[in-house]
């Protein structure tokens, strides 16, 4: 685990974006942890968040032309990531996001920002069922662009309804790389290194043993 990944977990815990306990997911599973990126909700939070996304992009080595943030949660993520790439990596990247409903006045259409062209890096908070990615792919393909990859904050590394995770299903269906700032494996490593949350560590390990990929 790299320094920025450890710092991201500490940041998420500090802001209570990442919590340990017992949580019922939409799937009905009881999870020992929960991640709610909507709680990164101040200017300073977003500035820090963008730096972590930018660090993960730089670390990945994936080449892309435009950042795309799917409405709604992906919009501030794409914006702050573009700023962080410019400020901290000297990379001036165009960004774009979609509207849920197309406008028929002014500039019109359902896209805001740069042209959606070339190789697209999609940024979002998490992938649960992959629905947002599939909807975004329709937009990307309709504009004649290609999906270079997807970056999310956390990869839960757990099975969906079948043997694959939602992320693995997206990788299989669209042939693109899915990267994350951190993964469940990183979370376990963090708890092991910290050594003060034995109960949480054991519950996360048990969950991984049952649902992990």
UniProtKB/Swiss-Prot annotation:
Residue sites binding 5-phospho-alpha-D-ribose 1-diphosphate per the record: 26, 72-73, 99-100, 103, 105, 124-132
E.C. numbers: 2.4.2.10
GO CC annotation, single: cytoplasm
Signal peptide per UniProt: none
Catalytic reactions on record: orotidine 5'-phosphate + diphosphate = orotate + 5-phospho-alpha-D-ribose 1-diphosphate
Role description: Catalyzes the transfer of a ribosyl phosphate group from 5-phosphoribose 1-diphosphate to orotate, leading to the formation of orotidine monophosphate (OMP).
Summary of subunit composition and partner proteins: Homodimer.
Protein name in UniProt: Orotate phosphoribosyltransferase
């Amino acid at each position: 685990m790299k320094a920025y990944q450890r710092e991201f977990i500490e940041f998420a815990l500090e802001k209570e974006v990442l919590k340990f306990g017992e949580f019922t997911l939409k799937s009905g599973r009881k999870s020992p942890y929960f991640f709610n990126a909507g709680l990164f909700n101040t200017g300073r939070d977003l500035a820090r968040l963008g730096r972590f996304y930018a660090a993960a992009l730089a670390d990945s080595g994936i080449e892309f032309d435009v950042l795309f943030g799917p409405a709604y949660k992906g919009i501030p993520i794409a914006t702050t990531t573009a700023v962080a790439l410019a400020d901290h990596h000297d990379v001036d990247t165009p960004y774009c996001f979609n509207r849920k409903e197309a406008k028929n006045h002014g500039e019109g259409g359902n896209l805001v920002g740069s042209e959606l062209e070339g190789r697209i890096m999609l940024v979002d908070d998490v992938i649960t069922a992959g629905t947002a990615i599939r909807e975004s792919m329709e937009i990307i393909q309709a504009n004649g662009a290609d999906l270079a990859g997807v970056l999310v904050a956390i990869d839960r590394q757990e099975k969906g309804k079948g043997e694959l995770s939602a992320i693995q299903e997206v990788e299989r269906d669209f042939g693109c790389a899915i990267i994350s700032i951190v993964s469940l494996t990183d979370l376990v490593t963090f708890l092991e290194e910290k050594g003060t949350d034995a109960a949480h560590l054991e519950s996360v390990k048990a969950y991984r043993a049952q649902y992990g990929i």
